[in-house]
Amino acid sequence: SLVKSDQICIGYHANNSTEQVDTIMEKNVTVTHAQDILEKTHNGKLCDLDGVKPLILRDCSVAGWLLGNPMCDEFINVPEWSYIVEKASPANDLCYPGDFNDYEELKHLLSRINHFEKIQIIPKSSWSNHEASSGVSSACPYLGKSSFFRNVVWLIKKNNAYPTIKRSYNNTNQEDLLVLWGIHHPNDAAEQTKLYQNPTTYISVGTSTLNQRLVPKIATRSKVNGQSGRMEFFWTILKPNDAINFESNGNFIAPEYAYKIVKKGDSAIMKSELEYGNCNTKCQTPMGAINSSMPFHNIHPLTIGECPKYVKSNRLVLTTGLRNTPQRERRRKKRGLFGAIAGFIEGGWQGMVDGWYGYHHSNEQGSGYAADKESTQKAIDGVTNKVNSIIDKMNTQFEAVGREFNNLERRIENLNKKMEDGFLDVWTYNAELLVLMENERTLDFHDSNVKNLYDKVRLQLRDNAKELGNGCFEFYHKCDNECMESVKNGTYDYPQYSQKAGLNREEISGVKLESMGTYQILSIYSTVASSLALAIMVAGLSLWMCSN
């Protein structure tokens, strides 16, 4: 009698996942497992960076802080900072209207500084021949009274005289020194003589690298903060053992304090309206802190710290599993003892939960799933290593801080913005292309592993079993559980079963030949009968036509 279909099928895992990925060839491919590599969340707070607090200037600008705007007294002495936070339009800037020369360059310098130590270089009390306390303005109020910047001194004439100033400071510190000074531009000649006595004045400043001569620009101007005059501030970095020399006969705003640069490092001036969140992070953006090991984010292009790379993408998902096409249950006519078993062509197996690839067998002892642990583990290791490699390579920590330009540098600013946008487009394209290509390769890798497992079984069974074309093999001999296990572990003994398989194969072939002979006789009979009937009809038609 004929052997009732003992079978073994090769298939792959399926589950209830609805995760979808894109590949080079397809979109929205449902897979069993996937890994998101794009961070899209933040905490909406300003945090410490690696345990170091930021310097949050609140309503003060950098200029207001450095010059000592009376409304910025909380920042007279500040500890080490990780980064500086300034609002887009801080209220407490230059209280006395004017300009801060090379302000953007100074901010760029601050992006490489983590700590200042404020030191007195020319005491206010040392100006015995000039009024050092009368230089105040209603534009810089403090407690309802006129005041002035805390770190500089506005020198006024004394006893209707303004003797020429000659003052020097030698930097005996081991650190660089940030020194600030300024010039007052009066509204008219009357104000000039009222404040400084001398109608024609100048300010000279010199170091080993600086040679500056300033003269006041007297002009009628619109009032700002109640003032028609203007002040212009300057700065320089004084190196150790270098001296700065001042000479002036009027309009001089002298330095009282300077900033010793005691610690340099990676910092930034970040524009943000957020409040301090009493938290810690490795990556800060103006929108909030990011705590993520993902290689990409789409939160904000400007960052400080160890951050993922910003891209414009909305979705970057790497597949780690297989195509998820669960086998659909459908009514089938029963075949053999255990019915038909679909293989990997018809869909994945949700019943196989302990591996990615494996077997389903059926024989007289029963049926069941078994994962191929070796191929599954190799695949898991391969995919995991690949994903980790991609993340490691792309997770080079990036820092992108904003750059500021003055009004004369708008064309440079526009060019810089176009270049940065171009770089972002390239990074985004590269990231998306990388994901598409790697997803395609991963799915092909899984398909190849299933095929390899199939070929492993096929090469063992040879002509002892029949390929059903759906990932399954039907044995020409009885295959009990021990036999099935030998197929799975690669120790199937082909010679042991070949004689019995050969007899059954010949018996099946004989049945096919006998059936084929019957079909051929019926076919010949049908052909002859049809031809004879057609000949009789033609002859009858001819006789009828002739008789007419």
Curated annotation (Swiss-Prot):
Extracellular side: 1-520
Keyword Secreted: no
Molecular function in Gene Ontology: host cell surface receptor binding
Name the record gives this protein: Hemagglutinin
Domain of life: Viruses
Keywords, comma-separated and alphabetical: Clathrin- and caveolin-independent endocytosis of virus by host, Clathrin-mediated endocytosis of virus by host, Disulfide bond, Fusion of virus membrane with host endosomal membrane, Fusion of virus membrane with host membrane, Glycoprotein, Hemagglutinin, Host cell membrane, Host membrane, Host-virus interaction, Lipoprotein, Membrane, Palmitate, Transmembrane, Transmembrane helix, Viral attachment to host cell, Viral envelope protein, Viral penetration into host cytoplasm, Virion, Virus endocytosis by host, Virus entry into host cell
Membrane-crossing segments per the record: 521-541
Location in or out of the cell: Virion membrane; Host apical cell membrane
Residue positions bearing lipid (S-palmitoyl cysteine): 546
A single GO cellular-component term on record: virion membrane
Something else known: Major glycoprotein, comprises over 80% of the envelope proteins present in virus particle. The extent of infection into host organism is determined by HA. Influenza viruses bud from the apical surface of polarized epithelial cells (e.g. bronchial epithelial cells) into lumen of lungs and are therefore usually pneumotropic. The reason is that HA is cleaved by tryptase clara which is restricted to lungs. However, HAs of H5 and H7 pantropic avian viruses subtypes can be cleaved by furin and subtilisin-type enzymes, allowing the virus to grow in other organs than lungs.
Glycosylation site list: 15-16, 28, 170, 291, 489
PTM notes: Palmitoylated.
Disulfide bridge map: 9-472, 47-279, 60-72, 95-140, 283-307, 479-483
